[in-house]
């Protein structure tokens, strides 16, 4: 999909909206010039949050599209959230707009805005027993660290203590808690905007039993939730305790993933401690991962939920909105903003800028340089609808839009599982490269010269090869399911056959003993006969000697 967008179409289809916006703009301008600043305006501690000027322009243009389509609720009017969605669709406005619309629809249908108040996950202790996972501390850059011990996952018992729907609800609830509490707390502690996490996956002991059909169905659902509604939130991932076979499989799996994604994933063996300590302080790393933390007073590291969000002072500042940050472009890194706290949107005084930079007083739409928009197609909006590059970002408790567990991780583990159970993958399948992550567009290369100055091309895989792999995996999975479904006790008919075989063996053993006894008796009798024959021979020799002696005496008259 080309990055070119004809913004004039939106204006032609919505003349009433545009005129309404212009009237609102005039009224708002008058009110702002006549009224004094609200007494609620106060200076807060500013956190530097520099961004590329081109990204600010693209986000602003996307914001205008959302406003025209009436798809920008106040709580989602957040720069970082819109930028993540744009990156997820490679800055394709049309696809990003569709993704954003689907996200709003999903949040309304799922009830994501109220899940923290409405949902209670009573079986959390049992779930963590069969699926050890959770946050523990932050890395050296202030990002929260999420840990999963996949080798200890028992998906069968997990589905016995909860249901798939309830676990998905719990998953979304943890997302919302992270966005509303954890990332704002990390931002205050690090004095910069935090909206990504560091993930550690311990795969020691991972086998087929950890990824049966129930586990894969759960991963698929979580992947869809993450990829569609919480994109671009993984900073880095460490897969530790990976054996030689796992690393070999990873080299194959990498060909299925976007290089941008694989650059975030580090597969390590059992000597991972030094690498983790480069990223995470020992005091923030659990002892079983090479750190010094035990969390003995909180039931262990996997149950402690350690992090700055447990600090009362930081949470007080989060509740007061102190995690609001200033947004400055790299082109203009000067000027200090005043943040207005109140029910209405923030009223700010933008610093004086060069005429080449967009200003909120100039009713122009900031367009990406790659867009070929004729001059006649440009239109004006109210200054409330324009993001000035120097304008401070509005961050509330809902502004930390980043998940605990991204769709990238779910996809990687799903592909690893597929490769583990399918030994005979076609050769050309392993040699191909495909962008399989749900947060990217199609396989056509897209021009991002204004953003990165590079082009990335992809190669597709044939549907026949993919279906062959999936069919093979389904067959093997069915065999494993059938074997797992067999009872632990022996069926009655087989038990009878076994008892008959044992009885027959006992009978044969008795016959063998009798035969052995008969052989022993025969051997004894044979020995007796041999002794009797020897005695007869000796007696015969004696008689013959006596006869010879008698005849000799008789003949010679002795």
Swiss-Prot record:
GO biological process, one term: protein transport
InterPro entries found in the cross-reference section: CRAL-TRIO_dom, CRAL-TRIO_dom_sf, CRAL/TRIO_N_dom, CRAL/TRIO_N_dom_sf, PI/PC_transfer
CDD domains found in the cross-reference section: SEC14 (cd00170)
Sequence similarity: Belongs to the SFH family.
Domain named CRAL-TRIO: residues: 123-297
Protein name: Phosphatidylinositol/phosphatidylcholine transfer protein SFH10
GO cellular component: Golgi membrane; plasma membrane
Localization terms from the record: Golgi apparatus membrane; Cell membrane
Cited function: Required for transport of secretory proteins from the Golgi complex. Catalyzes the transfer of phosphatidylinositol and phosphatidylcholine between membranes in vitro.
Protein topology in the membrane: Peripheral membrane protein
Disulfide cysteine pairs (residue numbers): none
Keywords (A to Z) from UniProt: Cell membrane, Coiled coil, Golgi apparatus, Membrane, Protein transport, Transport
The UniProt record lists the keyword Protein transport: yes
Coiled-coil intervals: 464-529
């Amino acid at each position: 999909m080309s990055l070119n967008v004809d913004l004039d179409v939106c204006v032609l289809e919505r003349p009433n909206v545009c005129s309404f916006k212009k009237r609102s703009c005039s009224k708002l301008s008058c009110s702002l010039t006549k009224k004094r600043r609200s007494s609620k305006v106060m200076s807060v501690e500013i956190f530097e949050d520099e961004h590329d000027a081109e990204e600010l322009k693209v986000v602003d243009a996307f914001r205008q599209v959302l406003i025209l389509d009436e798809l920008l609720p106040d709580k989602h009017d957040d720069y970082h959230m819109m930028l993540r969605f744009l990156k997820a669709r490679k800055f394709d406005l049309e696809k990003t707009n569709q993704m954003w619309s689907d996200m709003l629809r999903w949040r309304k249908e799922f009830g994501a805005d109220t899940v923290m108040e409405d949902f209670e996950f009573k079986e959390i202790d049992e779930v963590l027993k069969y699926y050890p996972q959770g946050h523990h501390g932050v890395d050296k850059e202030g990002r929260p660290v999420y840990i999963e011990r996949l080798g200890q996952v028992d998906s069968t018992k997990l589905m016995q203590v909860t249901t798939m729907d309830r676990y998905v609800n719990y998953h979304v609830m943890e997302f919302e808690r992270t966005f509303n509490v954890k990332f704002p707390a990390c931002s205050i502690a690090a004095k910069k905007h935090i909206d990504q996490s560091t993930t550690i996956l311990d795969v020691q002991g991972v086998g087929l039993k950890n990824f049966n059909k129930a586990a894969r169905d759960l991963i698929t659902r979580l992947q869809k939730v993450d990829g569609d509604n919480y994109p671009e939130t993984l900073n880095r991932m460490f897969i530790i305790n990976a054996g030689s076979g796992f690393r070999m499989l990873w080299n194959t799996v990498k060909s299925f993933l976007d290089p941008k994604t694989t650059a975030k994933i580090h597969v390590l063996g059992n000597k991972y401690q030094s690498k983790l300590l480069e990223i995470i302080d020992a005091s923030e790393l659990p002892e079983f991962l090479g750190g010094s933390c035990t969390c003995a007073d909180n039931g262990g590291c996997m149950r402690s939920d350690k992090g700055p969000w447990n600090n009362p002072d930081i949470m007080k500042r989060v509740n007061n909105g102190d995690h609001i940050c200033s947004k400055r472009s790299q082109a203009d890194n000067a000027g200090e903003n005043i943040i207005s706290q109140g029910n209405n949107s923030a009223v700010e005084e933008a610093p004086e800028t060069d005429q080449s930079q967009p200003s909120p007083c100039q009713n122009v739409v900031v367009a990406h340089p790659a867009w070929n928009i004729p001059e006649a197609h440009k239109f004006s909006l109210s200054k409330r609808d324009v993001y000035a590059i120097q304008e401070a970002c509005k961050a509330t408790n809902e502004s930390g839009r980043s998940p605990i567990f991204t769709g990238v991780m779910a996809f990687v583990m799903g592909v690893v599982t597929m490769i583990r159970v399918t030994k005979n993958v076609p050769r050309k399948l392993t040699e191909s490269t495909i962008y399989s992550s749900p947060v990217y567009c199609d396989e056509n290369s897209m021009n991002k010269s204004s953003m990165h100055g590079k082009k990335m091309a992809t190669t597709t895989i044939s549907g026949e090869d993919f279906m062959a792999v999936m069919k093979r995996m389904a067959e093997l999975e069915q065999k494993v399911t059938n074997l797992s479904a067999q009872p632990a006790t022996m069926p009655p008919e087989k038990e009878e056959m076994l008892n008959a075989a044992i009885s027959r063996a006992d009978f044969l053993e008795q016959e063998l003993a009798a035969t052995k006894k008969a052989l022993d008796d025969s051997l004894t009798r044979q020995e007796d006969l041999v002794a009797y024959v020897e005695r007869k021979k000796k007696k015969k020799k004696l008689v013959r000697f006596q006869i010879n002696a008698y005849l000799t005496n008789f003949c010679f008259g002795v």
